């Protein structure tokens, strides 16, 4: 899909930690297999065959939305939205690269598999 938006624009006027978190996240997601980054006006979507995650940059942090088939019970989840019978959007605020841990990657990998 061709758009007028590029990934780099999402990091203008943002703290360097925002880019560090994004780069760390993308590096880990690459281990799942092939995927595409699709930049939009307000976010960057990560796609396998369909979108499995969305990344919105803020001044000092990232908002990661994971698209999954069941709610996640964790204090890390800031919002859960049921969008259909078996689909949930899970919102997680990431403020440091250290938050990209095994738990988060397990959730992302589940979403990646679901989107394939």
PLM feature spans:
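Charge-dense, helix-prone N-terminal extensions
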Residues: 1-116
């Amino acid at each position: 899909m061709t758009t007028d938006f590029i990934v780099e624009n999402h990091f203008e006027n943002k703290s360097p930690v925002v880019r560090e978190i994004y780069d760390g996240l993308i590096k880990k997601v690459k281990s799942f297999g092939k995927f595409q980054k699709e930049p939009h006006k307000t976010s960057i979507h990560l796609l396998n065959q369909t979108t499995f995650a969305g990344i919105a940059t803020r001044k000092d942090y990232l908002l990661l939305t994971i698209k999954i088939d069941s709610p996640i019970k964790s204090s890390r989840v800031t919002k859960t939205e049921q969008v259909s019978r078996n689909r949930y959007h899970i919102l997680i605020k990431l403020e440091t690269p250290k938050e990209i841990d095994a738990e988060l990657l397990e959730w992302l990998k589940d979403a990646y598999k679901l989107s394939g």
